[in-house]
Amino acid sequence: MPEQFLHGIEIVRIDDGVRPIETVKSSVIGLVGTAPEANDERFPLDTPVLVTSRRTKIAGLGTTGTLPMATDGIFDQCGAMMVIVRVTEGINREETISNVIGGIDNATGQRKGLQALLDARSVAKVHPRILIAPDFSHEMAVATEMVSIANNLKAVVVADGPNTTDEAAISYRVADRKSVV
């Protein structure tokens, strides 16, 4: 008969030996944007690409568009793991916004734009939990689509608010608890 009977959970802590370093799965950023000079092999259009460090493929983004600036900013602050979806820069702003919002290609069935983040788990083997689209998320159509994707992925949207007045920033609400402006 044991001398001591334990009620509940017993925790055994092992303080020696080698333990793997793991990335917190809630910190994976899903980033959608443009990079016209990007290497098409490293960053194919409308395809989730996993980036784990500054040296891993980032040089292939080029210097123009929204993705190079966004990735530099992220790596300057923390260096988080990212799933990047590069979209085509349109002839005008409206076309580019349409490309960011994306959808499904009727001919191939491939998801495009923000919709491509839904394929991140099968393609990049990670699940983005923080969704951003720098320079586009202040557009209500983009922010609304981001919230829709976030609900599906159980993620959070970090959206840019309007940069006009305090009243406009307060009234800019996507009406969902999964968004941060």
Where are these regions (language model features)?
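Surface-exposed assembly/interface segments
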Residues: 1-181
